[in-house]
Amino acid sequence: MTTLTISIIVVFVLGYALIATESLTKVNKAAIALLMLVGCWTLYMMDPMQYLQLMHPDYTGGAAGMVEKVTGIIQEHLGDTGTTLFFLMGAMTIVEIVDQNGGFNWVRKVMKTKSKRALLWRIAILTFFLSAILDNLTTSIVMIMILRKLVTDHKDRMVYASLVIIAANSGGAFSPIGDVTTIMLWNKGLITAAGVIAEIFIPSVVSMVIPALILQTMLKGELVMPEVSDQQNASVSDFTEGQRKAVFWLGVGGLIFVPIFKSITHLPPFVGILLVLGVLWTATEVFYRGLHRGADTEGTQKRVTKLLSRVDMSTILFFLGILMAVSCLAEIGVLTALGQGLNVVFDGNHYLVTGIIGVLSSIVDNVPLVAGCMGMYPVAAAGDMAVDGVFWQLLAYCAGVGGSMLIIGSAAGVVVMGLEKITFGWYMKHISWIAFVGYIAGIVCYWFIRTFLYAI
């Protein structure tokens, strides 16, 4: 490992440490993430040829075409990152439109309960199954908006929000469209929809239920429900009940339609999100036109053109910085070397290898980790490495559920961290060990099913 490679790793680790101690340094994590991005890629450009020869052995352009090649690599990573960012912005805007126009009012009525523990289980179950249909990112945004309607105490809401992260990641792990890593494995033909649902569903449930059982001990007594009328809660008082329900179903139904749109058109998911946003935007404009509002009324402040300013840009920039910094680690070969090293150290024990990969996925982005594994391990005709084999199914589970162990270990965690202002330190102290217990329990459950039930 060269000095330059070590320097890049040091910059990443230092930035990661500063993000982890945001509550102490009082420096916004988005600023640190952007500095990580620039620092890692600037060091990379000091001697890119060694990395081109390592990661792109087919490159024959020499020094003359080096800059052009690296520029293309960065643009490719930026394109991949951009699809995530546009998806995030679109989903956040859609949920904001539904929320501000009273679309979640009736959901609030359905979820309403005075018992803190009863609400915890309703939130857990709804998040789990919604994440399997949508994705953990969109589900987390929707559930946080619903929680804000139900829970006024921020300390209690942090507990609920933490369970949203765990349930969203667990729910996405057993569904071929629930998480970006399962989508990758499914599209590559390494797992089948029927196989991953049949064998990962129960471990995923276990990884959610056990943390929920522990977390409910942190919640005692009854909720103080926010006393807000439907008209106040809707923000736009002149919207009828039918219009509010239309906004809800166009928004949430549209989000459910996104994976269907992707499977039909084979376009990236962000295109489907933009389609839903366009349809919902048009519908609300038609509703407003029928209200004949003046330009300065309160209701017009809730139109999409006004709501766009409410999108949390610091979260978007944080995503940009983290994903691009991790892509630099991928380009210097660190992630691939790490995966190969795990296989050697643990002598091909796939439970240990995938288990460690799951832990690592809570530290760095799980996408390059899974991509590295897909490139390192060939598909076998039979055995653990076959389609729907132990390795690939455990990889889907571990890469998805493992991200719950740290709040910045998954897209769901990062979004909830930004929306609810949960610090890295608080989550690590109170939630990480709980998520880890659920994670291990799910692996043990999978081992039991494969070893005993499938052996019958």
Regions found by a protein language model. Name each.
Residues 1-4, 24-27, 55-59, 66-84, ...:
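Interfacial loop-to-helix junctions that mark the boundaries of transmembrane helices
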Residues 4-7, 153-154, 158, 174-175, ...:
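Juxtamembrane and boundary regions of transmembrane helices in multi-pass small-molecule transporters
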Residues 6-15, 26-63, 81-93, 244-254, ...:
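Hydrophobic mid-bilayer segments of alpha-helices in multi-pass membrane transport proteins
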Residues 9, 34-35, 85, 120-125, ...:
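Hydrophobic alpha-helical transmembrane segments
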Residues 40-51, 78-79, 130-167, 171, ...:
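Membrane-interfacial helix-loop connectors
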Residues 43-76, 92-109, 129-141, 328, ...:
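Transmembrane alpha-helix boundary signature
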Residues 60, 79, 101, 108-110, ...:
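Transmembrane helical segments that form the transport core of multi-pass membrane transport proteins
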Residues 79-89, 195-213, 265-278, 352, ...:
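Alpha-helical transmembrane segments
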